[in-house]
């Protein structure tokens, strides 16, 4: 019996060394979410916005091969003043001929305009899901990439000024990714994945409709792998088309980009999106872990995704 146990132990060690794939820690990602939310609302021009920028920059400077800061100015629809924004780009394995982008926005919405309580409609939101969740996943990926270098070039891009737009005017949103796409600081990006609103406790991720048009091959590969890995949040159905940071990447930079997003937060009957209820209690480590697991698979198990 003792020899069987030793054999099984050695087999497990061999397999873990053979794969070289690190384990995504959902609790660490959730802690990243909590730390962002502790700064309060992070809408452009706020104290929280400045504080979380420093938080992200300080963290990735310790973890990435190099960090680029892309500064820009932008207007918020209906306001006379100009705002300063910063896209934060954490790069790994710059010499690889294959460069991919995984991105998320780090700002939060200035107004809870979808809140049923009208007295809240001009208040800024905490943005635990819509703002902190994608960043939380990226920061955990940054930690793993430091510990286990990838065979391809990974560019973790934290986009600013995504969520200060108004309904009916798409380009009043996504100011950071629009600027990035028109002024590319990185050459040769093969494809891109945007993570947005991925912390919902009731996470359900259909295929975003634009993504299917922009990069059908990547969509099929990711959702197929999610099924293989039994990551239940990824649903094999096509959802609505959403204007998100992947659209400027495709339209202005020609980067085949997709969006992983659960816009029905938390479900079709209740709405926390753009309300004062977008708080950490309505997010979970388990949801972040599901998305993070698939991103780890995408980064390290390249045989399923191409060179």
Where are these regions (language model features)?
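Structural recognition of the beta-strand scaffold that forms the well-ordered cores
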Residues: 89, 99-103, 127, 155-158, ...
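Solvent-exposed loop/turn segments at secondary-structure junctions
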Residues: 43-44, 73-75, 94-96, 106-110, ...
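Acidic/histidine-rich catalytic neighborhood of metal-dependent amide-processing enzymes
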Residues: 122-217, 241, 245-246
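Second-shell loop/turn segments in exported
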Residues: 20-23, 38-47, 75-79, 121-131, ...
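A non-catalytic alpha/beta surface segment that caps or lines the substrate-entry region
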Residues: 31-95
């Amino acid at each position: 019996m003792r020899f069987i146990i030793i054999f099984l132990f050695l087999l497990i060690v061999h397999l873990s060394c053979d794969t070289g794939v690190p384990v995504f820690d959902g609790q660490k990602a959730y802690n990243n979410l909590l730390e962002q939310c502790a700064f309060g609302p992070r809408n452009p021009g706020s104290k929280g916005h400045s504080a979380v920028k420093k938080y992200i920059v300080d963290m990735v400077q310790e973890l990435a091969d190099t960090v680029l800061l892309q500064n820009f100015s932008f207007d918020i629809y209906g306001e006379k003043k100009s705002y300063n924004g910063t896209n934060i780009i954490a790069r790994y394995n710059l010499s690889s001929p294959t460069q991919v982008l995984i991105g998320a926005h780090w700002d939060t919405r200035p107004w809870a305009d979808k809140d049923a309580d009208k007295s809240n409609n001009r208040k800024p939101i905490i943005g635990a899901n819509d703002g902190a969740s994608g960043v939380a996943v990226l920061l955990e990926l940054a930690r793993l990439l430091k510990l286990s270098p990838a065979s391809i070039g990974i560019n973790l891009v934290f986009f600013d000024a995504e969520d200060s737009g108004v309904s009916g005017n798409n380009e009043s949103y996504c100011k950071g990714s629009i600027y990035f796409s028109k002024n590319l600081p990185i050459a040769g990006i093969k494809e891109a994945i945007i993570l947005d609103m991925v912390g919902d406790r009731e996470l359900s991720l259909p295929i975003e409709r634009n993504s299917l048009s922009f990069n059908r091959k990547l969509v099929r590969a990711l959702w197929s792998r999610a099924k293989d890995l039994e990551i239940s949040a990824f649903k094999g159905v096509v959802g609505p088309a959403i204007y998100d940071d992947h659209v400027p990447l495709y339209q202005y930079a020609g980067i085949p980009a997709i969006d992983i997003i659960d816009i029905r937060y938390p479900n079709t009957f209740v709405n926390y999106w753009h309300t004062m209820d977008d708080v950490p209690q309505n997010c979970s480590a388990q949801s972040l872990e599901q998305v993070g697991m698939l991103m780890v698979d995408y980064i390290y198990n390249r045989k399923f995704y191409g060179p």
